[in-house]
Swiss-Prot record:
Expressed in heart, brain, liver, kidney, pancreas and placenta. Not expressed in skeletal muscle and lung. Interacts with NUDT9. InterPro entries: GLOD4 (IPR043193), GLOD4_C (IPR043194), Glyas_Bleomycin-R_OHBP_Dase (IPR029068), VOC (IPR037523). The keyword Repeat applies. It is found in: Mitochondrion. It comes from the Eukaryota. Pfam families: GLOD4_C (PF21701), GLOD4_N (PF21207). The lineage of its organism: Eukaryota, Metazoa, Chordata, Craniata, Vertebrata. It comes from Homo sapiens. This is Glyoxalase domain-containing protein 4. The modification Phosphoserine is found at residue 146. Its main location: mitochondrion. Keywords: Mitochondrion, Phosphoprotein, Repeat. The modification N6-succinyllysine is found at residue 288.
Length: 313
């Protein structure tokens, strides 16, 4: 399964300005793309698998009905880096967190230095490992070291209610390799290749709560494998959230997508690799597009003027 790749994790963000500051100034990531002009419209569907971020017509008042943006950030191109997809709905101010997303771990002494310089809260949870939070409460673990590899992002940790059941799903059905397993601590580290970001499954008691802030992890595989993957899930009576579909992006590649859910309801997007590589190329204007979008965003003022709070997700 080495042809499969870990791509990105989708976060819902309520404060786009502070979120951009965290990813750019604290972590040191670059803006890969910002799909403001193309996708900020009611009913738009992102070929990066964030269609669930759409807002219904009656969610909040004009002029922000259904208006949202998507920004990709990372330490390098998504071809060989694990990145974050930040989805922002203009009419939503915050999202309730569950216990499903447990954190992203990255190795970057520069990020630790940046956080200290900017007085961004850090808590040392192990020797040389610092816990911090992105706006919205999403946890990040910063290892105070730098690796020779190009991508500092080491792993994404998700909560599971039954580790063995989850391992059967992720390994036997999705083809991931077990890199580490600790029965006593109820954790396992999985991946598709040694040089890719890993997926860590951590057992929790009392079940997995996705709340409103639930995200989605995305992978790619050769496009020809997608129908077989969908058929396998059907045969195994596993949940398919979005059957195999082609998503068009004007002026760009058409990408095939299937969206699954694991036994705990974690959303998993698989895309056809060949077209996705074309679609996910870095946009040199990405950072400027984000800055322009934030400068033009008067939603906070509009809601305050009309004495309306932004919705809570």
């Amino acid at each position: 399964m080495a042809a499969r790749r870990a791509l990105h994790f989708v976060f819902k963000v309520g404060n786009r300005f502070q979120t951009a500051r965290f990813y750019r100034d604290v972590l040191g990531m670059k803006v890969e793309s910002c799909s403001v002009a193309r996708l900020e419209c009611s009913g738009a569907i992102s070929a990066h698998c964030s269609d669930y971020t759409r807002i219904t017509e009656d969610s909040f008042s004009k002029p922000y009905d259904g208006k949202w943006s998507k920004t990709m950030v990372g330490f390098g191109p998504e071809d060989d880096h694990f990145v974050a997809e930040l989805t922002y709905n203009y009419g939503v101010g915050d999202y309730k967190l569950g216990n499903d997303f447990m954190g992203i771990t990255l190795a970057s002494s520069q990020a630790v230095s940046n956080a200290r310089k900017l007085e961004w809260p850090l808590t040392e949870v192990a020797e040389g490992v610092f816990e911090t939070e992105a706006p919205g409460g999403y946890k990040f673990y910063l290892q105070n070291r730098s690796l020779p590899q190009s991508d500092p992002v080491l792993k994404v940790t998700l909560a599971v209610s039954d580790l063995q059941k989850s391992l059967n799903y992720w390994c036997n059905l999705l083809g991931m390799k077990i890199y580490e397993k600790d029965e006593e601590k109820q954790r396992a580290l999985l991946g598709y290749a040694d040089n890719q970001c890993k997926l860590e499954l951590q057992g929790v008691k009392g079940g997995v709560d996705h709340a409103a802030a639930f995200g989605r992890i995305a992978f790619s595989c050769p496009q020809k494998e997608l129908p077989d993957l969908e058929d396998l899930m059907k045969r195994e009576n596993q949940k398919i959230l979005t059957p195999l579909v082609s998503l068009d992006t004007p002026g760009k590649a058409t990408v095939q997508v299937v969206i699954l859910a694991d036994p705990d309801g974690h959303e998993i997007c698989f895309v056809g690799d060949e077209a996705f590589r074309e679609l996910s190329k870095m946009d040199p204007e990405g950072s400027k597009l984000l800055d322009d979008a934030m400068a033009a965003d008067k939603s906070d003022e509009w809601f305050a003027k009309h004495n309306k709070p932004k919705a809570s997700g």
